[in-house]
């Protein structure tokens, strides 16, 4: 019999058939499954209990009704949000040092990056960027001090008191530990 993780041999004994050759392989396989489940979403975000389900851009509860996303008791772990069978997606509640730069109309007609989007990505190396729900915008994720959100010249910046729909449609790979964002 072979270990499901390392393919090493497992000694067959009486009782339940073992799947892994050791506790170390069982733990490594668990961590790998967890990492695969989060896809491209940075580990630091996936580990934060700041997720909710949503329909479109509206946070939604199990009953299908609009959710009060500002109440912590309504927040989920990433895996709970990802695996829930209601709503059509999930989002992240800003706060606790997480920030996002929300950019609209990021692509030129030829598919190249618009100058503003290119500048923001250049100024934030290591930040994780995903395409927005429309596919035309970008969310640039990182760490940010608690500050009032603002909208200016095609840029929206938020670090608390806001819900952002997450697509997981990676545009720029980021660090496992998110960097400080610059606007």
Label the predicted regions.
Residues 32-183:
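Conserved phosphate/metal-binding and DNA-contacting active-site motifs used
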Residues 1-35:
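BZIP DNA-binding basic region
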């Amino acid at each position: 019999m072979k270990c499901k993780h390392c393919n090493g041999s497992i000694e067959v004994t009486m009782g339940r058939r073992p799947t892994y050759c050791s506790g170390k392989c069982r733990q490594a396989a668990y961590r790998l499954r967890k990492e695969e489940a989060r896809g491209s979403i940075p580990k630091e975000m996936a580990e934060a209990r700041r997720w909710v389900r949503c329909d479109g851009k509206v946070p939604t509860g199990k009953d299908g009704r609009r959710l009060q996303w500002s109440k912590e008791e309504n927040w989920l772990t990433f895996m709970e949000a990802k695996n829930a069978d209601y709503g059509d997606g999930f989002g992240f509640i800003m706060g606790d040092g997480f920030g996002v730069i929300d950019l609209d109309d990021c692509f030129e007609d030829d598919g190249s990056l618009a100058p503003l989007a290119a500048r923001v990505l250049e100024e934030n190396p290591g930040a994780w960027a995903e395409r927005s729900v429309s596919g035309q915008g970008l969310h640039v994720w990182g760490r940010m001090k608690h500050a009032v959100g603002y909208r200016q010249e095609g840029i929206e910046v938020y670090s608390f008191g806001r819900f952002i729909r997450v697509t997981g449609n990676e545009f720029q790979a980021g660090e496992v530990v998110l960097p400080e964002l610059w606007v």
